Curated annotation (Swiss-Prot):
The E3 ubiquitin-protein ligase activity is stimulated by PEX12. It is an enzyme of class 2 (transferase). This is Peroxisome assembly protein 10-B. Residues 38, 123-147, 237-326 are cytoplasmic. Belongs to the pex2/pex10/pex12 family. It is found in: Peroxisome membrane. SMART domains: RING. Pfam families: Pex2_Pex12, zf-RING_2. GO terms for cellular component: peroxisomal membrane.
Amino acid sequence: MAFSSANRPQLIRSSQKDEQFQGSLRGQAHEVCQAFAGAKKWLQWRKEIELFSDLAYYCLTTFSGYQTLGEEYVNIVQVDSSKRKVPTLFQRAALICCHTLLPYFLDKELVRLEHELQIETDGVRLSHSGLSSGSHRRSWMWKWVHRKIAALSEQQKKTLVKAVYIFRQSIAFLRRLHLATFYIKGAFYHLAKRFTGINYLRVRRSIGDDQLVNRSYTLLGAISLLHLMLLLWVQFNSFQQRQEAQQKWKVLRRMSYQRAPPHEKSYKRRAKCTLCLEVRRHCTATPCGHLFCWECITEWCNTKVECPLCREKFSAQKLVYLRHYR
């Protein structure tokens, strides 16, 4: 019996169904952790809980040689690049690592590197910060990184901070570019499957005209590419405007700080925003309890709807401006 390649709607529906079941599994894991370990431990380990939930899901399905619930839902099966054999155990393990472990560790280590650079640039170690809570038990690698960062000049540190930020944005850009390519070519929906060469075959014949569906998705891919180019141009202009606004804001802060009373100055030395690394102005709280400048956090929320420190997801409407906060 000859099998044909899975079409784009099947791959998308399969991924969406898997995400739905993974979200349900994560929610149950969060509830169990909160019930037994408390809210404090849950806040500290919630990213790791999500990681282990995803690993459990894929180990019980893909790694064990079974279809995921999403794949079973649309009647597709995994095959290797030859489309004649099922993926080997090594390929399945590599797929799970690239799909779950790699994004987690990449995001975690980049955030940590960015935080280290900001601390060194500022010259103050925030011992109570959520991101530096494990600084006293650093691994040998991070001790080496810390020594190398300490040896850099201030200008080099600032340049490296920008480079890390651009690299993180480039990862998001690459994902969107890959998605647009999928709409046009229809080969791999996830980057991890492209790296491991895992394809899909459909068990049953799909209902509908594949050529008509493919033309529709090709048009969607072209529109996505155009939108991505426009977004890149807008972000570049926005980045330049932010740089100019940041310089003006630093001048205004310096003038305000020089006019402040001595007792207010001594307090403000401790109250600094971790985004701009300047004295915190117009203090604003996120739902998770972290404090930032109003201008800094609202600007951050224009591109990312998450806390810069703990990565808790929230909408900009949830920000609380703390009037007369001392």
